Each structure stands twice: as C-alpha cells, then as structure tokens.
C-alpha cells in the first residue's frame, strides 16, 4: 500500500457510505494495512460521520472517531462546521489536514484507504462537467470506475486522485476488475502508479493495449490522440495523432516525459501506445 499522503479536499474518494463499523474495522485490521491508513464512513448517528484509523501494528489496532456536526448557532440556525471530541473545525478538509500533522491516539492520518476499482474506462468524448459533483475529462483520458450510482452516471477517479460523477455513455470499458476488498488494500491505484496493483483484472476489450506492456525506457511510442495543452503550462508537450515520440520517463502522476523534435514535455499515458520492437 502507498503512504504518499492524500488530498483532504478529495475526502469523498475515501468516504464509504453505508459501510458498517465492523466492516471498516475488518478492512483496516488486515495485517498488510499500514499504520496511519484511514477511511471515512457514515456514523450510526444520522447526518454524521466516523473516521476509522489503523493506529498500531500490535494487535492490528483500529480506532473509530465520531465526526459530529458543529454546535447550532446562537440564533438556532443550522450547525456550522464539524468537530471531533472537543476540537472544532470549519469543515471536513480542515479536520483531516489537522490530523495529517498531529496524532489522534497513536498515529497521524498518513494514507487514505481508497475505494476499490470496478472497471477502468477511457473517455470516448470530452466531458467538461456541469455540476460541482461532476468529474471533467478529456477524450482518451483513462479513469477508474469506483461505483455505478445508476445506469447513466458512474463514480470515477482520475490519475490525480480526483473523484466525481461521469456520464456512462461518454466512456468505454477497457478493463474489468475483480476485487476482494476485505483481503487487500485498495489504496493502490491502477492509474498513475508505477508499481503493480493488487487487483486482478481481465481485458474487456478485443483490441490490444500496448500501453499496459511498458517496455524498458527510453522507448518509442505512437501518439493516439491529438493534444493541445494549456499554453501557459510549458511543461506539457503538444502532440498530434500518428506522431512518434521518445518516452524517457514515467512520472509519479501517471504521465510520461517524452521528446519530440527537440522538445521535451509531459504527455498523459492514455495518449500513447508503445510501438513493437519490429516497428
């Protein structure tokens, strides 16, 4: 499992609605789960949350903390903020960030236990998003599907770890995952990770996906989609479909560093397909 931090503002990516205290305890109590790994779930008290944390290796210790709504205002209007024990915070990200740097009982919050992956999909169209809960993506961008809230909208996670809803008819399934989340840590992402994921998967596409068979770098790769990055970001490489680039490095954010006509920059791995040795 990775312990490279988390984004407090993306707390819904490690929030498990409907999960019981017992299931959360079992998940984080597994021997392979690292100290400081945590998740959020619904409390038995309606409208409030619980923070479940792996605190120690001895006895696979797991602790549960109630996240309460803040005290109602003096005028009787809705409660403001949240609190844990006797400490109050303006919102959940502030609470998580506080305990990222401070100890709860025996450990700080080090790594989020992320939702397991159901499927990996690729965007067939660009989606800009209309609501705060939507997850915008580009054509060709790769996403992890975490849950299918209904037939039309799925919960997804991108290479940066941002989660949100995506329209099902804007993506194409690339891989199906078969997870047993009670026996393995699901914080390992298949997107943006250079290590091997714990999940088992089977291809759901009849076409070959050479990007999964990464050769030793540096290596040549074909560009599969046109890409015009933000003009104000000089670290990104502009490429056109059909061009051949030299990939020199795979970065921790899931992008590749590549060279083209003397220019060096970053390209999302979903825009590249490694060429066979004979090509």
Curated annotation (Swiss-Prot):
Gene Ontology terms: biological process: actin cytoskeleton organization; apoptotic process; apoptotic process involved in development; cell migration; engulfment of apoptotic cell; enzyme-linked receptor protein signaling pathway; positive regulation of distal tip cell migration; positive regulation of engulfment of apoptotic cell
CDD domains hit by this protein: SH3_Nck_3
Domain of life: Eukaryota
GO cellular component: cytoplasm; plasma membrane
Record has Repeat as a keyword: yes
Region (Disordered): 181-213
Function, in words: Required for cell migration and engulfment of cell corpses but not for programmed cell death/apoptosis. Has a role in the migration of the 2 gonadal distal tip cells (DTCs). Plays a role in protecting dopaminergic neurons from oxidative stress-induced degeneration.
Family: Belongs to the CRK family.
Name of the protein: Cell death abnormality protein 2
């Amino acid at each position: 499992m990775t312990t490279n931090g988390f984004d407090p503002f993306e707390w819904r990516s490690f929030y498990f609605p409907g999960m019981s205290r017992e299931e959360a305890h079992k998940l984080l109590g597994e021997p392979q789960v690292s100290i400081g790994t945590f998740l959020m779930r619904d409390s038995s008290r309606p409208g409030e949350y619980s923070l479940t944390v792996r605190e120690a290796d001895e006895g696979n210790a797991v602790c549960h903390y109630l996240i309460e709504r803040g005290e109602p205002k003096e005028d009787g209007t809705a409660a403001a903020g949240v609190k844990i024990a006797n400490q109050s915070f303006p919102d959940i990200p502030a609470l998580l960030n506080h305990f990222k740097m401070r100890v709860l009982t025996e450990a700080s919050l080090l790594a989020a236990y992320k939702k397991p992956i159901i499927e990996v999909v690729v965007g067939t169209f660009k989606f800009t998003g209309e609501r705060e809960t939507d997850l915008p993506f580009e054509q060709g961008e790769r996403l992890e599907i975490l849950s299918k809230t209904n037939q039309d909208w799925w919960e997804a996670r991108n290479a940066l770890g941002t989660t949100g809803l995506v329209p099902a008819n804007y993506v194409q399934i690339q891989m199906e995952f078969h997870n047993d989340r009670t026996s393995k840590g699901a914080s390992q992402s298949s997107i943006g990770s250079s290590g091997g994921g714990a999940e088992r998967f089977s291809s759901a596409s009849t076409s070959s996906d050479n990007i999964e068979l990464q050769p030793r770098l540096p290596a040549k790769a074909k560009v599969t989609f046109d890409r015009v990055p933000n003009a104000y970001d000089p670290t990104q490489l502009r490429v056109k479909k059909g061009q051949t680039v030299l990939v020199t490095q795979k970065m921790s954010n899931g992008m590749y560093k590549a060279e083209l006509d003397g220019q060096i920059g970053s390209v999302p791995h979903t825009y590249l397909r490694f060429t066979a040795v004979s090509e």
